[in-house]
Structure formats: structure tokens, C-alpha cells
Amino acid sequence: MKLPGADTFVSRLMQSHVATGLLSVTPVPLFLVRSILLRDNARENRNGGWQRLREASESARYRAVRGVVERYARDGFVLDVGCSQGILQEGLTYRRYLGVDNSEQAVAIAKAKSDLRTDFVCADGSDFVADQPPDAVVLSEVIYYLSDPVAAVQHHGRHLAPGGVLIISLYARTWPSRRLMRRLAARLELVECHLVRSDHLAWTVAVLRPSTQGVAGDEPAGSYPSRESEMTRNA
């Protein structure tokens, strides 16, 4: 059965082994990727989509991200930037959780899960500032949508609690996403980086902190993906 909103360009692309293989070696500009994703995002929200994120092919990524979040902020405050309908929050252990998304439709659905420790707000996640410093800021499959993803990540790094971390998940097998990860690793401290596999798909899950060494040059050799290790396989 076809899920609502699932028939988008990106969802069809990701189902193709050939297409994902080509994407891994094709230098597609990030602005072009962003324009396609924003169009598909609007369609998914309009048609009540995103239920495809509950499919088995996505479960390995969610398990990996939740595991990393709980390792660093199990008893802390988690800020989930680009939370959509709050799927990451489901099953996550935390002291406080705040999800932020710019889609009114998605946030309206997510708010059904609000309680004393959990809330969702509709806002632009790029420059959002919470009412208290978070112990972990999560950007899971969202930085491609941002007009300046590196600046957004650095912004959230400046507002972390002492010892806080940035947890980023992005699709691993495209040229623009790998370049974006290298740019982030050049400007922030890369604490750990894992590859999460599910069928023919793969995601990078990275933990970063604000750098105490200043800003390095763009895309330093050896910082990524040489520090990447495989985390999960769900073939």
C-alpha cells in the first residue's frame, strides 16, 4: 500500500539502486538538492506524508540517532531541529525534549505527544534559541534544507550547555552530503562519526562540538571520512 505523500521525486530516487549509485559520484550543487527537497517537503506536509519515515528502511537510522542522543543527553535537555512530526522523540529517553519545525502541519501532529517534559514549536530552526541551553542539539536529515547549513550548525554550537554536543544525521551516499560533512568537520570538533546502513541506503551520524582551535581550512584531508566507523547494519 502506498503511504500518503510518499510518491515524491526524492522517495522514488532513493528506491533505485542505480540512482543512488549515480548520486554518490555526481557533484550536484547543494542549492539544487535543497530546491528539490524543499519542493518535496512541501508536498509531503500538504498531503499528510512522512509516514514513510516509519518504514523498516528508516528504523536503523532512528535507532542509531536515538542511541547517540541518549549516550550524551539521557538525563539532559534535547533540542530537535527539524523535528517534523516528532518521530525521533518516540522511544527517546530524556529529561526535557523540545522539537522545532517550520511546518505548521507537522508540528500540529507532533503536539499530540506534548507533556510536562515534551513540547513542539513551529519556528525557523536555523537561528532558533531555546529558553535554556540544550545538552544536545539534533539535526537529523534536516541540514540539506537550510540555506546556510554550516552557519546554522555553528549557531546552535554557540548556544549549547557546557559539555553539550551537536548530533547530525545526513544521507551518506551523495557527493553534496559528503562535502557538507567535510565542511562541518573543518569548522567544528568531530567527536565521533558512524555509518548506518539499511539495505542499499546509508547515513552518516556524527557528533560534533564547537572547536577550541579556531576555524580550520575548508575540507581538511583526513578528518572525514577516515574517522568514520560502521555502527549498524540492517540488511
Predicted regions and their residues:
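A short glycine-rich, Lys/Arg-flanked "PGG" loop and its adjoining helix->strand segment in the class I
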Residues: A152-P162
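A short SAM/SAH-binding and catalytic strip from SAM-dependent methyltransferases
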Residues: A136-D148
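Core SAM-dependent methyltransferase catalytic element
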Residues: V196-A235
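Conserved class I S-adenosyl-L-methionine
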Residues: A6-R71, D75-S84, T174-P176
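A short acidic, Gly/Pro-enriched loop at the edge of an enzyme's catalytic core
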Residues: V129-V137
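Class I SAM-dependent methyltransferase SAM/SAH-binding core
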Residues: Q85-S126
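Conserved beta-strand signature within the Rossmann-like core of class I S-adenosyl-L-methionine
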Residues: G164-L170
